[in-house]
């Protein structure tokens, strides 16, 4: 175990000098020995010659000074894995931060690992029912798939993710890992108590590196959560991996890249953006032993989906749920855009011909309404043909029927949440498109579950 000395400290970047014959490898973890700051860990990022390595601090570098001794552990950061992590809150290093004592793990894994080989990977077409009408209809999720929730600031990414956790994780017999990457500490706290109240805390491992943490923590915390999920998958379990927020992972990479002195690329992002995203996403996969179904929130800067960060994420996903500010402005929640959201599972060979036809029918009606909006704005409804008037009326009902009350928003709305089965969703939209409910007022469709609820509501209007 070689030792070196700190020769330079610039914020989160620390240079350590070792003997020429015992220079640590890239990604090795170094421990700083100091009476006041004994727990600080550094991760080697670059070897810059003459025995000097440039590292990123996995914690606050306050009180760090030149001359302190750094011990090379000879391996990457290792974190606890296995049953002992369930019900616990950990930081990037796998240390408990819930004041419930040591984790007492039997096994630890390094956070840098190779993704499964092609031979080991497995595809799945089994659908995961979420109980959210617009998702189950337009962009169905696959068990073992990768799902992204895209949206700008304040359109409901976290609320949608919490609802999916509520509907899937609580009913799901497997295990869940929740990774908070650069988001609000309050949300992590709320999540912990929600899981506790639901009695499923013993099935969830939580790893947090929130927005007040240094960039090193935020860059590596996603890998820590993923490593815990991989262990469960390799044991033959089905795991749900929630990551909130992938954009903060990219942003932490940008900060680290700038601190290391790399030249920025497009829009100021790090030149290694695609590679860093690939390193994380390629490991989130299912094997013949078990599956990882991942749901990731992706912040979209300035609502621009062509920004390099969300654009790089798109390539890795099986289903994309796009949240729209325009739909949120109309007061229609969940503000999921049915014309922008996609899924590889929406294929007649996977979901069946009926489901496919209904979903495409809904999109066709909404697309036609979108095209007619300009004419309506200029000339008014009276100038439309009878067919177009009918299309507009149905489209407005479809828009409203795509809304539903959420369990997690019950405290704000006062309306109890509803889980809508796929069968009820298909029945409702099929009837709507065929004209069965043309005489029902459009207000009746707002915030209802199945079509039977709409008919009941219409009777009271």
From Swiss-Prot:
Protein function: Produces ATP from ADP in the presence of a proton gradient across the membrane. The catalytic sites are hosted primarily by the beta subunits.
Top-level taxon of origin: Bacteria
Protein source organism: Photobacterium profundum (strain SS9)
Membrane topology category: Peripheral membrane protein
Enzyme class: translocase
Keywords of the record: ATP synthesis, ATP-binding, Cell inner membrane, Cell membrane, CF(1), Hydrogen ion transport, Ion transport, Membrane, Nucleotide-binding, Translocase, Transport
Catalytic reactions of this protein: ATP + H2O + 4 H(+)(in) = ADP + phosphate + 5 H(+)(out)
Location(s) in or outside the cell: Cell inner membrane
A GO molecular function held by the record: ATP hydrolysis activity
GO cellular component entries: plasma membrane; proton-transporting ATP synthase complex
Residues that hold ATP according to the record: 151-158
Protein name: ATP synthase subunit beta 2
Protein family per UniProt: Belongs to the ATPase alpha/beta chains family.
Oligomeric and partner information: F-type ATPases have 2 components, CF(1) - the catalytic core - and CF(0) - the membrane proton channel. CF(1) has five subunits: alpha(3), beta(3), gamma(1), delta(1), epsilon(1). CF(0) has three main subunits: a(1), b(2) and c(9-12). The alpha and beta chains form an alternating ring which encloses part of the gamma chain. CF(1) is attached to CF(0) by a central stalk formed by the gamma and epsilon chains, while a peripheral stalk is formed by the delta and b chains.
